[in-house]
Amino acid sequence: MLVLGIESSCDETGLALYDTQRGLLAHALHSQIAMHREYGGVVPELASRDHIRRALPLLEEVMAQSGTHRDDIDAIAFTQGPGLAGALLVGASIANALALAWNKPTVGIHHLEGHLLSPLLVDEPPPFPFIALLVSGGHTQLMRVTDVGVYETLGETLDDAAGEAFDKTAKLIGLGYPGGPEVSKLAETGTPGAVVLPRPMLHSGDLDFSFSGLKTAVLTQMKKFEAAKLESEALERAKADLARGFVDAAVDVLVAKSLAALKQTKLKRLVVAGGVGANRQLRAALSAAAAKRGFDVHYPDLALCTDNGAMIALAGALRLGRWPEQANADYAFTVKPRWDLASLAR
């Protein structure tokens, strides 16, 4: 089965072709970072308009890369939610318009299911069951994954997502957009232990997260720096130490909760997905813990940590392979800006 995947939930337009026999044939991605940078964050209306501009050229690109003709495609998968309503509508409209013109069925995909399954795109994919740590700008969750479509939420953030905390911390420190990669890069130059920040809910006894207090601690520390009237060079060193303190605290919590989930479920496989899954400090800490504790940890390729069409095409192929009745051939569709992954129907 050959599936075209279309991702447009936020500020990346992604298209890809996935074949159940040959694997990922082609994928193309356009990021809107440069467009949104001057606003310091994603502007939904601009995001929607840019998806309209980019989708068809990206389609031509993946078709040319793979030597695929439209007649070769068996189905079209699109991100149905969660995400920005306007952005989702663009992708859904394009998917269903193509499907109508080409006489193909469609299937709507949960954005987080795409992330959760993206590590299956590697050469040696992890077998089910496993624990999934989903960490992105909008979500932080621990899931027990028994099979495709069989997901149980074990813990989630009670306020800010981890990626949101990274972005907001970067803004407080005075770094550029997008903040996550910038604060991580600065943290690598900071001194370990120079600034120690709280580890929220580290000993809460459950698998939930909270990052708003950590963000507040960064704000408090920045106010102290301002009150001290540090010279320029000293201030930059202090900011680097603060960034290191923030990243260390966030990573400690993510690792500790992941280990607790593995212990609670007695599983030996951890899958890490979402944009924050590209963070080098997090990967290093989890890999070290895996070596020490005797479990396996799996990541998607770095290029597939961000939003992308490949994960949507894969999820579509897996769903249609198991449940052909989920194929939609009447081209009526809705989008779901809010959508709980645990409620996803098989």
From Swiss-Prot:
Q: Write down the chemical reaction(s) this protein catalyses.
A: L-threonylcarbamoyladenylate + adenosine(37) in tRNA = N(6)-L-threonylcarbamoyladenosine(37) in tRNA + AMP + H(+)
The species this protein belongs to is: Burkholderia ambifaria (strain MC40-6)
Query: Which compartment or compartments is the protein found in?
Result: Cytoplasm
The record, for InterPro entries, names: ATPase_NBD, Gcp-like_dom, KAE1/TsaD, TsaD
The GO cellular component terms are: cytoplasm
Name it.
Answer: tRNA N6-adenosine threonylcarbamoyltransferase
Q: Which GO terms describe its molecular function?
A: iron ion binding; N(6)-L-threonylcarbamoyladenine synthase activity
Which HAMAP family did the record assign?
TsaD
